[in-house]
Amino acid sequence: MSYSAYSESKVNPMHVVIMGCGRVGSTLANELQALGHSVAVIDQEREAFRRLGSDFNGKTVTGVGFDRDTLIEAGIEKAEAFAAVSNGDNSNILAARVARETYGVQNVVARIYDPRRAEIYQRLGIPTVATVSWTTDQIMRRLTPQGKASEWRDPSGAVQLCEIFVSRDWYGKPITLIEK
């Protein structure tokens, strides 16, 4: 089920700029539009915009997602959110930093493929989604038997949230007693 299916029907509309019109970018654009947001999508290839479908009524801009003129044409100056979801880690981080540092966009996220870079980018203040790590975690969760399958792991791997099944004897007991 999509994110919009879980969202409230009334939202405060915002302008969102998305760099990259692949499967993720086009799906994100359509989901945001369905929630009532105004959306501009940037891609270097004009053909990529076909993925948006005929119902998309947002703005499409052909260009490089960290180029000043391209960003201005996409409405970055009024944007409340920016998502960099192209197929290049470096381009995504550069575009996200430009959106945040040059144009003051507060809600910024960059997709990255190389999970080893995630911690570095987090230190730069750019929230990232490491698709390879996330996908691996989700597949492992479904493949491994009940137990300590990872539900979520932060990009650095320092924090991991796990779902475990506990005995009825543990109900209502403090964790300190269970650990013994």
Annotate each PLM feature.
Residues 1-180:
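Cytosolic regulatory regions of ion transport systems
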